[in-house]
Amino acid sequence: MAVSNASVVLSPNLETSSSWYHHNPSSSLDLIRIHTLPMNKMTRRGLIQRVRCETSPSSDSSPLDKLKNSPAIDRYTRERSSIVVIGLSFHTSPLEMRERLAIPEAEWPLAITQLCALNHIEEAAVLSTCNRIEIYVSALSRYRGVKEVTEWMSKRSGIPVSDICQHRFLLYNKDATQHLFQVSAGLESLVIGENQIQSQVRKAEQVVKQEGFGRIISTLFEKANKAGKRVRAQTNIASGAVSVSSAAVELALTKLPGSVSSAMMLVIGAGEMGKRIIEHLVAKGCTKMVVMNRSEDKVAAIRKEMQSGVEIIYKPLDEILACAAEANVIFTSTSSETPLFLKEHVEILPPCPADYARLFVDISVPRNVGSCVAELDSARVYNVDDLKEVVAANKEDRARKSMEALPIIREETIEFEGWRDSLQTFPTIRKLRSKTERIRAECVEKLISKHGNGMDKKTREAVEKQTRIIVNNILDYPMKHLRYDGTGSSKLRETLENMQAVNRIYELDGELLEEKIREKKDKK
């Protein structure tokens, strides 16, 4: 039986993820269908592994692809810098773990600086949202790099390495690239096609570029934004798509015994998520609500955008308990790293005005409403992971839309990987010149030592000049075949195959890796 050649490390508790779909186009639809079937976790995992194992590598793989994927000859993937994503998402990990690992946007630059200081990490980027925490790195050694990043995540969050390993997913190179492109396009979102994730990917790109942390990862995120835009422009993936905010409103309304017009609504947080909640509440017929925020400016701006007849009352955050006492439904979407509501806060609130349990819908990560609040009979608490029941109704439509987007994702992935592969020839050219120059210099030095004082300065200069000419002439033909001019994939494949041959013949792979590690240690 042929085995899929995807470089994915599965954790024991890993659930399905659409990042697996691209390993073989013919198996993509089967995997999406498996993901949407009602079954327990063990059954689903078994079916997925069966589908993936029955997938054979493409018969028209280039020699370079065969070299990259050969189990016997993996120097290419071991010695070249690898793009790696170490991630945890709502597919693979509980909310309790994700909120401890979450990195606020304001701390992304510091996190990137710390990651790039690790011995085997050249470049890094952070993507932390309510549904995922993903670290993208360019690693000198994929195995050491993964180990260092995982230990960094453990140290930062206080979660044991073993627990992170149990729930993380790892993707390398092309798989990591395609995964990010799918994330940007909304294919990996809880709500397929939602737009907010693309703005979050764009923010991650801006942070990487502002901090100047490397060309590979910044270009990766730049191309991910391009892929996301193409998918939304050229497919129907965003048509009728709900967002996390709209799903939160839908969930609240399904749990609300009375009508939306008679319920007292409290929205805490007027950022992008909070604004979307307000818009969806208005669309559902809510004409009055209280909105709390650190400052009134954002609330005033939202109020101006709303239609006439909608009353939005601003309250400062220090009045949170007084406002909560008057509300039937409370939405929270702030960036606070500590809970706004704990059990001791909620249990002293007067009974809900309509004499039923007060609803808390918390779409923040870390959570704004402590899990202990759910222990109270007077409160019903829902978080981002509870939104799955809202979006479960349109699984078939989501699967169809995902299939529309995959050809674009594959095309963009091939383009980026071609660009990245073309960069690999430059270190080879530099190292080949360095090695031949070292050999030439050693031979000239031996010649001079042998003849001693019998060689005058003029003769020495002539020897230096002629030996350099000889070396340059010898290198002329290899160098021509190591330079990629950007004219097509077939030329690129040929160039990369030549590069691998030169690396192998002249034993440059180990030297390239050692040089990079030495340079990084020198900088530190």
UniProtKB/Swiss-Prot annotation:
The keyword Kinase does not apply. During catalysis, the active site Cys acts as a nucleophile attacking the alpha-carbonyl group of tRNA-bound glutamate with the formation of a thioester intermediate between enzyme and glutamate, and the concomitant release of tRNA(Glu). The thioester intermediate is finally reduced by direct hydride transfer from NADPH, to form the product GSA. Keywords: Chlorophyll biosynthesis, Chloroplast, NADP, Oxidoreductase, Plastid, Porphyrin biosynthesis, Transit peptide. GO terms for biological process: chlorophyll biosynthetic process; protoporphyrinogen IX biosynthetic process. NCBIfam families: hemA (TIGR01035). Belongs to the glutamyl-tRNA reductase family. Substrate binds at T129, C130, N131, R132, S189, E194, N195, Q196, Q200. Coiled coil: none annotated. Pathway: Porphyrin-containing compound metabolism; protoporphyrin-IX biosynthesis; 5-aminolevulinate from L-glutamyl-tRNA(Glu): step 1/2; Porphyrin-containing compound metabolism; chlorophyll biosynthesis. Residues 1-52 form a transit peptide. One of its GO terms (cellular component) is chloroplast. The record marks H179 as: Important for activity. Pfam families: GlutR_dimer, GlutR_N, Shikimate_DH. Catalyzes the NADPH-dependent reduction of glutamyl-tRNA(Glu) to glutamate 1-semialdehyde (GSA). It comes from Arabidopsis thaliana. The keyword Transit peptide applies. Its main location: plastid. The lineage of its organism: Eukaryota, Viridiplantae, Streptophyta, Embryophyta, Tracheophyta. It catalyses: (S)-4-amino-5-oxopentanoate + tRNA(Glu) + NADP(+) = L-glutamyl-tRNA(Glu) + NADPH + H(+). It is found in: Plastid, Chloroplast. Its EC number is 1.2.1.70. GO terms for molecular function: glutamyl-tRNA reductase activity; NADP binding. The active site is at C130. The gene is HEMA3. This is Probable glutamyl-tRNA reductase 3, chloroplastic. NADP(+) binds at G269, A270, G271, E272, M273, G274.
